[in-house]
């Protein structure tokens, strides 16, 4: 059985036992979070409008971290204007425990 869940403005296909990196959630490591289900798949597919009523995905927060550094540059020709800035996107790592519904 699998489910499509939405968190952080993105959609993910999840199954029990899967480790997943999502946009940073406001939850402590070791806590459990419930994610809304957009679609349930398996023997019979159930599509939500927009979410499947009575269905949820239970996940455990494994920890928080920061992604790889990306560099952003600004440049304007002929005026010696150059700027370089780095960014590391924060994330939360989840372990999918079960799919209810």
UniProtKB/Swiss-Prot annotation:
One GO biological process term: translation
GO molecular function: rRNA binding; structural constituent of ribosome
InterPro entries cross-referenced by the UniProt entry: bL21-like, bL21-like_sf, Ribosomal_bL21
Gene Ontology cellular component terms for the protein in this record: cytoplasm; ribonucleoprotein complex; ribosome
UniProt keyword annotations, A-Z: Ribonucleoprotein, Ribosomal protein, RNA-binding, rRNA-binding
Transmembrane helix found in the keyword field: no
Ribosomal protein keyword on record: yes
PANTHER family cross-referenced by the UniProt entry: 50S RIBOSOMAL PROTEIN L21 (PTHR21349), LARGE RIBOSOMAL SUBUNIT PROTEIN BL21M (PTHR21349:SF0)
Job of this protein: This protein binds to 23S rRNA in the presence of protein L20.
Subunit note: Part of the 50S ribosomal subunit. Contacts protein L20.
Stated family: Belongs to the bacterial ribosomal protein bL21 family.
Official protein name in the record: Large ribosomal subunit protein bL21
Source organism of this protein record: Thermus thermophilus (strain ATCC BAA-163 / DSM 7039 / HB27)
Gene: rplU
């Amino acid at each position: 059985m699998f489910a499509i869940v939405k968190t952080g403005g993105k959609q993910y296909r999840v199954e029990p036992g899967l480790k997943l990196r999502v946009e940073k959630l406001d939850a402590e490591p070791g806590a459990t979070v419930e994610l809304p289900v957009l679609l349930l798949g398996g023997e019979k597919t159930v599509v939500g409008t927009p979410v499947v009523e009575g269905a949820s995905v239970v996940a455990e927060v494994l920890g928080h971290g920061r992604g790889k550094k990306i560099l952003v540059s600004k440049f304007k020709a002929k005026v010696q204007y150059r700027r370089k800035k780095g960014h590391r996107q924060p994330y939360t790592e989840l372990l999918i425990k079960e799919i209810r519904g």
